[in-house]
Amino acid sequence: MAIKHDDGTVLMRQEQKLKPPSMYQVLLLNDDYTPMEFVVMILQEYFSKDRETATQIMLMVHRDGKGICGVYPKDIASTKVELVLNHARKAGHPLQCVMEEV
C-alpha cells in the first residue's frame, strides 16, 4: 500500500510477518528438604493452579524429579522463575525452579 504526500514523497507500507514468541516451560525440581505443602502453595499462588492440579504436579516433582508448572513467553517464564526462587529463599527452602525452551 502506497501513501503519497503533498511534497511528492511516497511511503510504501511493508508487510511484516511476525513469528510467535519462543515459548518456555517453567519446571520445579525435586529436593529432599522443601515441604510438599510449600510446593503446592507455590503452584497455586504463582501458577494459578487449583489445589488438585497443584497436588498432581507436586507429586510428579516428587516422583519424577521435575514437574511442568506451565508454558509461557520468555519474559513471563523468567519472571515466574525469579518470583518462585525469591519466595523459596525467603521461606528458607532450597526449591529450584528453572525454565527450558519448548
From Swiss-Prot:
InterPro entries: ClpS, ClpS_core, Ribosomal_bL12_C/ClpS-like
Record GO biological process: protein catabolic process; proteolysis
Pfam families: ClpS
Origin superkingdom: Bacteria
Assembly description: Binds to the N-terminal domain of the chaperone ClpA.
HAMAP family the UniProt entry points to: ClpS
Family note: Belongs to the ClpS family.
Function in brief: Involved in the modulation of the specificity of the ClpAP-mediated ATP-dependent protein degradation.
NCBIfam families per record: PRK00033.1-5
The protein, known as: ATP-dependent Clp protease adapter protein ClpS
Taxonomic source organism: Herminiimonas arsenicoxydans
Gene: clpS
